[in-house]
Regions:
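Membrane-integral, polyisoprenol-dependent glycosyltransferases
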Residues: 2-242
Length: 242
C-alpha cells in the first residue's frame, strides 16, 4: 500500500504537532523570563545614548510635542528613512514618563526581546521537549548581537520579533491545519508590522521563506488560493493605513 496521501486527504489529528495546552505554566519558561528580565530590564538606562538612538528619540519627542504621528520629523525636517512604528512605541513609552528618556527609548526593544523569547519557546514546544524549547529560547536571548542591539533603541529587536513572528505563526497554523485564511492573514499582518518598523525587507523575507518551504515540501498549491489573496490584502490594508 502506498504511503502517499491522496490529494484531498488530511493528516490524522493524532499526527498533527501540538504544543502542550498549558506550556506557559512550565518552570522552564519561568527560568527564561528570569534570564531575560535580569539581562535586559534591570539596567535599561545604564548605557549612554549611541548609534541611531538619538534620532529615534528626537523623532518620538517631536511626535509628542506636535501631535503629528504620521510624518516622522527630526528637528522639523520630514524623515522617511525608516517607517514610524518604532518611533510610535518610544513615544507611547515616553508619554507615561513625562518625556522621552533613555528608559522609554529602549523599553520597546527590551519588550520585543522578551516577546521573541516567549514566542520561540511556545513554537519550539510544538515539536521539542521542555529542555529543547528552553535551549532554543536561551540561545536567542544570549546571542552576542541580540544582547548588544537588544539593549538599545534601534529597530532591530522589534523587526526581528515581527519577521520571525510572521514565519513561526504562519508555520504553526499551517502544520496544525488552521484555516488557510487565518494562516495567511496572520502571517501577512505581522509582515506588514515589520514593514512599518524597518521597510520592505519584511515581506521579502516572509514571502521568500514561505515560498521556498512550500516548494520544498511540494505544497505549492497552498499559495494559489483566495486565502493567500486575503493575506496580501491584509498586508496592504495595514501598511496602507500609514
Amino acid at each position: 500500500m502506498s504511503d502517499v496521501l491522496p490529494p484531498n486527504s488530511t493528516i490524522p489529528s493524532s499526527n498533527v504537532p501540538r504544543a502542550p495546552s498549558k506550556w506557559w505554566r512550565e518552570p522552564e519558561l519561568a527560568l527564561l523570563l528570569v534570564l531575560v528580565v535580569g539581562a535586559y530590564f534591570t539596567r535599561i538606562p545604564a548605557l549612554t545614548i549611541r548609534g541611531e538612538e538619538s534620532r529615534r528619540g528626537l523623532i518620538a519627542r517631536e511626535m509628542l510635542e506636535t501631535g503629528d504621528w504620521i510624518v516622522p520629523r527630526c528637528q522639523g525636517v520630514p524623515l522617511f528613512s525608516r517607517p514610524p512604528l518604532q518611533n510610535w512605541l518610544i513615544a507611547v513609552a515616553g508619554s507615561f514618563r513625562g518625556g522621552v528618556d533613555r528608559f522609554s527609548l529602549r523599553f520597546p526593544s527590551d519588550c520585543a526581546i522578551l516577546l521573541t523569547v516567549l514566542m520561540i519557546y511556545g513554537y519550539a514546544r510544538t515539536f521539542l521537549s521542555k529542555l529543547g524549547a528552553l535551549t532554543a529560547g536561551a540561545a536567542y536571548a544570549s546571542m552576542g548581537q541580540v544582547v548588544e542591539l537588544g539593549r538599545t533603541g534601534e529597530t532591530d529587536a522589534l523587526f526581528t520579533l515581527l519577521v520571525s513572528g510572521s514565519l513561526l505563526v504562519w508555520h504553526v497554523c499551517q502544520v496544525r491545519g488552521a484555516s488557510p485564511y487565518k494562516t495567511w492573514c496572520l502571517g501577512y499582518l505581522l509582515a506588514a508590522l515589520g514593514t512599518l518598523t524597518k521597510g520592505p525587507q519584511a515581506p521579502v523575507y516572509f514571502a521568500g521563506t514561505v515560498g521556498i518551504y512550500l516548494l520544498f515540501t511540494r505544497q505549492w498549491r497552498f499559495a494559489f488560493s483566495r486565502a493567500h489573496v486575503a493575506g496580501i490584502a491584509t498586508f496592504c490594508a495595514v501598511y496602507g493605513m500609514w
